[in-house]
Amino acid sequence: MIGKRIRIERIINRKTDRTVIVPLDHGVSIGPVRGIIDMAGTIDEVASGGANAVLMHKGMVRSGHRGYGRDIGLIIHLSASTGLGPDPNHKVLVTSVEKALKLGADAVSVHVNVGSEREPEMLIKLGTVAEICDDWGMPLIAMMYPRGKKIDDEHDPEVVKLAARAGAELGADIIKTNYTGDPDTFRDVVKGCPVPVVIAGGPKIETEEELLQMVSDSVEAGGAGVAIGRNIFQADSPANMTGAIAGIVHDGLSVEEAVRILKGGE
């Protein structure tokens, strides 16, 4: 499908088949936290650092997307819930593939909390959006997170494998999910999923070196890169953090080499 191939090349590096995506969609769920207040400034930093794409809600495109400088892919997030709602794990569709196309999006994303009480409704929406994406040639990223009463550990390799595979089975072109904690078990997740898998950053990680090690381990295991938000946009220097991560993902840098970029070296 030529439309999907063209658009995917705007968010995935064609030379490495990997990507560095920076999600900036957190404002709906947790409000205007540090790092996403000045959207244009943050996007400028992550673009200069080498991010392949940013991900945001429809209303923020006019506030932050590029009109200058280095080009960067645009992913529109179709799902939302607030932290104040009765069930924050229930993600609803708040816009459409057609609207994303009108905004100039290179891809769309849908969030599914696998194992939550409202999982069936979210799966229906994912499958429906996947079919519409096929009709329009629009790449679809499925954010597949294991969350629910039956799930004791959201990073358990077995539940992450199931979540990733479910997203691919329902038509996603790229899966975003949790890292399992070590390369061996994450390699099984990648093997079990026929489309590229990128890891989420999750809550703010304690040390930058720990984050970079996780990125390195995930690509070593066959991961297709990262979709990391808070650990990039709340870094002391989002540009340097993006550059360090991109160096690992695309250039094969070691963690030690990436730390030098993070600290402002070359």
From Swiss-Prot:
What family does this belong to?
A: Belongs to the DeoC/FbaB aldolase family. ADHS subfamily.
Q: Does the keyword Oxidoreductase apply?
A: no
Kindly list the positions annotated as binding 1-deoxy-D-threo-hexo-2,5-diulose 6-phosphate.
25-29, 145-147, 201-202, 229-230
Q: A GO biological process this protein is involved in?
A: aromatic amino acid family biosynthetic process
Q: Which SUPFAM superfamilies match?
A: Aldolase
Report the SS bond pairs.
none
**What is the protein name for this chain?**
2-amino-3,7-dideoxy-D-threo-hept-6-ulosonate synthase
Its subunit composition reads: Homodecamer.
Q: Which UniProt keywords apply?
A: Amino-acid biosynthesis, Aromatic amino acid biosynthesis, Schiff base, Transferase
Molecular function (GO) terms for this protein are: fructose-bisphosphate aldolase activity; hydro-lyase activity; transketolase or transaldolase activity
The organism of origin for this protein? Methanothermobacter thermautotrophicus (strain ATCC 29096 / DSM 1053 / JCM 10044 / NBRC 100330 / Delta H) (Methanobacterium thermoautotrophicum)
